[in-house]
Design a protein with these regions (language model features):
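Short, solvent-exposed loop/turn segments at secondary-structure junctions
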Residues: 23, 115, 149-150, 191-195
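Non-catalytic protein-protein interaction segments used by genome-maintenance enzymes to assemble
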Residues: 105, 109-166, 171
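Hydrophobic/aromatic-lined pockets within catalytic cores
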Residues: 22, 44-51, 134, 148-151, ...
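Metal-dependent nuclease catalytic regions and adjoining charged, substrate-binding loops involved
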Residues: 159-161, 172-308
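Nuclease catalytic cores
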Residues: 3-51, 109-112, 268-277
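Short amphipathic alpha-helical segments and their helix-coil junctions
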Residues: 1, 13-26, 143, 149-153, ...
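A non-catalytic, helix-rich entry segment at domain boundaries
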Residues: 41-118
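Hydrophobic (often cysteine-bearing) scaffold residues that line and stabilize catalytic clefts
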Residues: 31, 35, 39, 76, ...
Length: 308
C-alpha cells in the first residue's frame, strides 16, 4: 500500500479506484503540482551540495522545459512553462535561502524507497519514499521540502501536519532502520508560492521579506504518544476499507460513491477529469484524457517529468 493512496481513498473512494486499482490518472497534471515537483528537485540538488540554489534553479528549469518539449505535447509544454514561470518569480528569493539548522549528518539517505509491515495489518506492506533523512542532535529526522499556496499560513500548515500519515509512517521507518538514533520527527522546509518582486519598474515596486516566503520548523513525533497511536490506527482502518472496496470492484464491478465536492476541480470552477467517467461521457481508457499511473515510490528517475 502506497501511503499516498490512503490519502486519495479518504478524499474520494471512486477516484481512488480509478487511480490505484485501474491505475489511470489524468494525462496532464495541474501547473501548481508541476511547480511543486520542480521546486522539490531544486531543493534536493542544493541540499545535496550538488549546486547552489541559483544554479539549481537554472539547470532544473532548462531541463524541465527540454523534457516537456521532447514529448511533442502542447498541453504538457504549457504546464511546464507555467511551472518554470512560477520558479522564476521566486528565484531571486530562493538564492537567499539558508538552512537554519545544523546537521550532524545532513543526508543519511535521499529519495530512498522503503517497505514496512505492522503486526496489526498482516499481509499488508506499506511503501514510502522520504525526501531526505538526516541526523540532528543525535536524533533522526525526515526533511520535507514543500511548496505551499501563497495564501497558506505557515502555522496552520504545521498544526495540520501533526496528523499527516506520511510523517508518522516515516517516523516508524526511521526508528526501525536507524535504531542507533532517537526519533526526532519531521523538519519542514516550506516555501510560499509568492512573487518575490511585484510591480517591477513602477513607483510601488516592492519585494517580499524572506520570512514571508520561507519557513523552516521541526515537528516532533513521539512514537508512544496517543496522537501517533491514533494516526496509525486511523490509517490501518482506512486500509481495511480499501481492501473491501477493491474486492467488491474486482468481483462484481461495484463502484464506490464519489466525493461530489471534487467534481468541480480544486476550487469548484472547472470539470474534474474523473467527473466525466461518472456521467458516462468519457472513458478511463481514453488515452487522450488519461494515462497509466507511474509508480511514485520506485527509485527516483531524477527528472520529475511524467510523460503521457
Amino acid at each position: 500500500v502506497n501511503v499516498s493512496s490512503v490519502q486519495d481513498f479518504y478524499q474520494c473512494p471512486f477516484r481512488w479506484v480509478m487511480k490505484w486499482v485501474e491505475n489511470r490518472v489524468p494525462k496532464f497534471e495541474g501547473p501548481a503540482l508541476a511547480e511543486g515537483k520542480l521546486l522539490h528537485l531544486i531543493f534536493e540538488d542544493h541540499l545535496k551540495g550538488v549546486l547552489t540554489m541559483e544554479e539549481a534553479c537554472e539547470v532544473r528549469c532548462r531541463e524541465w522545459l527540454r523534457l516537456a518539449r521532447e514529448t511533442n505535447e502542447p498541453g504538457l509544454m504549457t504546464i511546464a512553462q507555467k511551472a518554470v514561470t512560477g520558479i522564476k518569480d521566486r528565484q531571486e528569493a530562493l538564492a537567499q535561502w539558508t538552512d537554519r539548522y545544523e546537521w550532524q549528518i545532513p543526508a543519511l539517505e535521499v529519495e530512498e524507497p522503503f517497505e514496512i509491515a505492522f503486526d496489526e495489518m498482516p499481509g499488508v506492506i506499506f511503501r514510502g519514499r522520504p525526501d531526505r533523512v538526516g541526523v540532528m542532535d543525535n536524533e533522526v529526522w525526515h526533511i520535507q521540502n514543500r511548496g505551499l499556496a501563497g495564501s497558506m499560513n505557515f502555522g496552520v500548515y504545521m498544526e495540520l501536519a501533526t496528523r499527516h500519515y506520511h510523517e508518522h509512517l516515516y517516523a516508524e521507518q526511521n526508528a526501525r532502520k536507524y535504531p542507533q538514533y532517537k526519533v526526532g520527527g519531521t523538519l519542514f522546509n516550506l516555501v510560499r508560492k509568492l512573487k518575490y518582486r511585484t510591480n517591477v519598474g513602477k513607483k510601488n515596486e516592492a519585494v517580499k521579506t524572506l520570512d514571508q516566503m520561507f519557513f523552516q520548523h521541526p515537528m516532533t513525533i513521539n512514537l508512544k504518544s496517543r496522537l501517533h497511536t491514533h494516526v496509525m490506527q486511523s490509517m490501518f482502518a482506512h486500509v481495511e476499507r480499501m481492501q473491501e472496496v477493491e474486492a467488491r470492484y474486482r468481483e462484481n464491478g461495484t463502484i464506490p460513491p464519489p466525493n461530489e465536492k471534487m467534481n468541480g476541480g480544486f476550487v469548484g470552477n472547472s470539470i474534474d477529469p474523473y467527473f466525466r467517467i461518472l456521467t458516462g461521457t468519457a472513458s478511463i481508457y481514453d488515452n487522450t484524457l488519461f494515462k497509466d499511473r507511474e509508480d511514485t515510490y520506485a527509485p527516483a528517475d531524477d527528472t520529475g517529468i511524467e510523460v503521457g
